[in-house]
Amino acid sequence: MKKIVFAVLCIALSICAKGQAERSPAPLKTLNIEFMMRGYFFAASSVPDKEAFGGFGTSANYPRDITTDMTVPDGTISLIARPFEEVVFAREYSGLKVWLVNGTNERLRFNAQDSRLYIVQEAIDVDGKWKPVEYLPSSWCGNLVFLDPKEYWEFAAARYTGKFKTRLRFRLQWQKSDNKKLMVYSNEFDGSVNAKQFTVKEEDTPTSIMDRHDN
């Protein structure tokens, strides 16, 4: 029994080290919850943050080079949702792929908390207004991550299911180097959530869904 537990632990640790969960041979579960989940868009960069005091959480999700077969806007920053591509989210749930792309010729910097970017998923509520269905927890451990020209980060995002059918998108709050704050929105897509996801925040417990997510 101890050997089995040790083997499972080794597999879990190897997945975490890669920074991106691999598909499990078992069918992926649907994510049907009744609360706002904490943000999970963690990113790393090869450029060190010389302004941070240290002690912040790190990530293994490093940038990738834009390839010729990728259809991405040139000359701008873009947040791209790819709902038609299923990926593993939090090791056992069906998710979708999201790209944050630097199509400019400049190195871009992004504020983060424990390497968590300011990205959340939003949905149109019953009143027809865009509202977040995820939230960013408070943290004193701020840091910067950098994205070089023609690079992008790839994320596995939550694909929610629920009784309320709606439109969804992702929103990035980006503070440029001149301290000007901008909102960057992804393309919209069809999906569903539960009504409580607009108001009830996930409890900060050791058994939360995000404890199974790879940074």
PLM-predicted stretches and their roles:
Residues 4-13:
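Sec-dependent N-terminal signal peptides
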Residues 17-21:
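Boundary at the C-terminal end of the N-terminal hydrophobic targeting segment
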Residues 22-95, 103:
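Low-complexity, acidic Ser/Thr/Pro/Gly-rich terminal tails and inter-domain linkers that flank the onset
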Residues 26-28, 35-53, 59, 156-215:
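Terminal connector regions
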Residues 82-85, 138-142, 155-156:
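Short structured motifs
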Residues 93-97, 152-154:
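Intrinsic-disorder/low-complexity, polar/charged segments enriched in Ser/Thr/Lys/Arg/Asp/Glu/Gln
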Residues 105-147:
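The feature marks short-to-medium sequence segments in extracytoplasmic or secretory-pathway proteins
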Residues 146-157:
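Short Pro-Gly-centered flexible turn/kink motifs
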